[in-house]
Curated annotation (Swiss-Prot):
Keywords: Clathrin- and caveolin-independent endocytosis of virus by host, Clathrin-mediated endocytosis of virus by host, Disulfide bond, Fusion of virus membrane with host endosomal membrane, Fusion of virus membrane with host membrane, Glycoprotein, Hemagglutinin, Host cell membrane, Host membrane, Host-virus interaction, Lipoprotein, Membrane, Palmitate, Signal, Transmembrane, Transmembrane helix, Viral attachment to host cell, Viral envelope protein, Viral penetration into host cytoplasm, Virion, Virus endocytosis by host, Virus entry into host cell. It comes from Influenza A virus (strain A/Equine/Romania/1980 H3N8). Residues 1-16 form the signal peptide. It is a single-pass type I membrane protein. This is Hemagglutinin. Homotrimer of disulfide-linked HA1-HA2.
Length: 565
């Protein structure tokens, strides 16, 4: 019994020599916030890395309708732009209209004499970009022919009619003289003249309308000349007609002259359209037009333009995000996410940023957790938090600025290529999209890498700042924590947080405690010997008690032990 008491006293004395068992020390850990479920983003080095927060950069849906503000959107309804320009009777309501964006519907149809335009897309684009159907009639003199020809295929009201912007010339009496007409451009703007040639379905129709068996139309300026000969022959019937009209156009520059020479089959201009330069355009869409505001329009409907990229449609009008192939690209706007471990040892010790993040810290990105004589606590470090936020704020705007600047340069260059080599138009467009899709992914990956690196750097800066403050008064425990070798109450912890900690005040106390602790650590062999001796004696006493019990039981006859030799 005396031996046991002595061992207990010795063990108590050994542990009582450890200064850390009292209120003379504190533990301070640095960490960053975390969330239970982060967002995966892509960086240069990782395809998937979890961050606390991220912003989607790709607009993937439209609002389902076309907004009529801030752009003037003109609904073509049942008319195509070309029919409205030519003056198809059912499109008369569009005469002299203006637009920023002309919407062509899939339900649009022609309701006049059947025609074709050899380069339909180019004429459509020229008129669309002009943004107006403003027309000026001119006094062409057509001598010896009959003007204002009409057709039952093109009725205006109950009467046979024709395109209102064209003048169909046929024979007068039994003659069709050669026509030579000139029209100078004395204005300071370009004039667009629309004219055509009629292709009869039979030779009989040719001579019946124009006398000559084969007509000819030549339209010239100082810069160009077009000579067209009619192709006589039957074609599929359209609105009761097997003949056709081919539509052409000529642009006359200021100071130039329009010359028309024909001996038959001429569909003459009545005047000109004033050419204008601007940002007007045309779009095929069946989306409804509504009263709302959106600066970006696609055939699917208007879309918000607060993101740098979109995956809704390649065709856009206005200030729109750039089209890319990816459905999603996420820009990291938070730090690397390391969810907090729910179980950390049997004593629930606090841990620093090396081990994991802290989900409970909601008032800042970086902060402190401490354990001292007054208990435990947590506080955010607003300065380092603000430093990180300031660097991340504006990333989205910078991405938009970079994409806009680069895109306009590429778009201008590609437009020149498309204008010269029409066969490369689709190839160039696809290449442009591929290029931007790659650039977008690379740009976002670079920005995400930068965000994660800078937020990690702010954590390290805070750790180094704290270490420099504490100096020899504390020891780095690893894992982002410090063991402070002096009594550090909440006010002391607060001074460390706000940078006013004076290590000289606590230096002597810290050194004294550190030496005591280190002294015990240096004599750890002595403590270990006592523990081993205590363990051995305890085992010996247990064996003695067990042996005494067996002998007592044998004497009482409760246990019989037979030994056979």
């Amino acid at each position: 019994m005396k031996t046991t008491i002595i061992l207990i006293l010795l063990t108590h004395w050994v542990y009582s020599q450890n200064p850390t068992s009292g209120n003379n020390t504190a533990t301070l850990c640095l960490g960053h916030h975390a969330v239970a479920n982060g967002t995966l983003v892509k960086t240069i080095t990782d395809d998937q890395i979890e961050v606390t927060n991220a912003t989607e950069l790709v607009q993937s849906t439209s609002i389902g309708k076309i907004c009529n503000n801030p752009y003037r959107v003109l609904d073509g309804r049942n008319c195509t732009l070309i029919d409205a320009m030519l003056g198809d009777p059912h499109c008369d309501v569009f005469q002299y209209e203006n637009w920023d964006l002309f919407i062509e519907r899939s339900s649009a149809f022609s309701n006049c004499y059947p025609y074709d335009i050899p380069d339909y897309a180019s004429l459509r684009s020229i008129v669309a970009s002009s943004g107006t159907l403003e027309f000026t009639a001119e006094g062409f003199t057509w001598t010896g022919v009959t003007q204002n020809g009409g057709s039952g295929a093109c009725r205006r009201g109950s009467a046979d009619s024709f395109f209102s912007r064209l003048n169909w010339l046929t024979k007068s009496g039994n003659s069709y003289p050669t026509l030579n007409v000139t029209m100078p451009n004395n204005n300071n703007f370009d004039k667009l003249y629309i004219w055509g040639i009629h292709h009869p379905s039979t030779n009989n129709e040719q001579t019946k309308l124009y006398v000559q068996e084969l007509g000819r139309v030549t339209v010239s300026t100082k810069r160009s000349q077009q000579t067209i000969i009619p192709n006589i022959g039957s074609r599929p019937w359209v609105r009761g007609q097997s003949g056709r009209i081919s539509i052409y156009w000529t642009i006359v520059k200021p100071g130039d002259i329009l010359m028309i020479n024909s001996n038959g089959n001429l569909v003459a201009p009545r005047g000109y359209f004033k050419m204008r330069t601007g940002k007007s355009s045309i779009m095929r869409s069946d989306a409804p037009i509504d009263t709302c505001v959106s600066e970006c329009i696609t055939p699917n409907g208007s879309i918000p333009n607060d993101k740098p990229f979109q995956n809704v449609n390649k065709v856009t009008y206005g200030e729109c995000p750039k089209y890319i192939k990816q459905n999603t690209l996420k820009l990291a706007t938070g730090m690397r996410n390391v969810p907090e471990k729910q179980i950390r040892g049997i004593f629930g010790a606090i841990a620093g940023f090396i081990e994991n993040g802290w989900e409970g810290m909601v008032d800042g990105w970086y902060g402190f957790r401490y354990q001292n004589s007054e208990g435990t606590g947590q506080a955010a470090d607003l300065k380092s938090t603000q430093a990180a936020i300031d660097q991340i704020n504006g990333k989205l705007n910078r991405v938009i600025e970079r994409t806009n600047e680069k895109f306009h340069q590429i778009e201008k260059e590609f437009s020149e290529v498309e204008g010269r080599i029409q066969d490369l138009e689709k190839y160039v467009e696809d290449t442009k999209i591929d290029l931007w899709s790659y650039n977008a992914e690379l740009l976002v990956a670079l920005e995400n890498q930068h965000t994660i690196d800078l937020t990690d750097a702010e954590m390290n800066k805070l750790f180094e700042k704290t270490r420099r403050q504490l100096r020899e008064n504390a020891e780095d425990m690893g894992g982002g924590c410090f063991k402070i070798y002096h009594k550090c109450d909440n006010a002391c912890i607060g001074s460390i947080r706000n940078g006013t900690y004076d290590h000289y005040i606590y230096r002597d106390e810290a050194l004294n405690n550190r030496f005591q602790i280190k002294g015990v650590e240096l004599k750890s062999g002595y403590k270990d010997w006592i523990l081993w001796i205590s363990f051995a004696i305890s085992c010996f006493l247990i064996c003695v008690v067990l042996l005494g019990f067996i002998m007592w039981a044998c004497q009482k006859g409760n246990i019989r032990c037979n030994i056979c030799i």
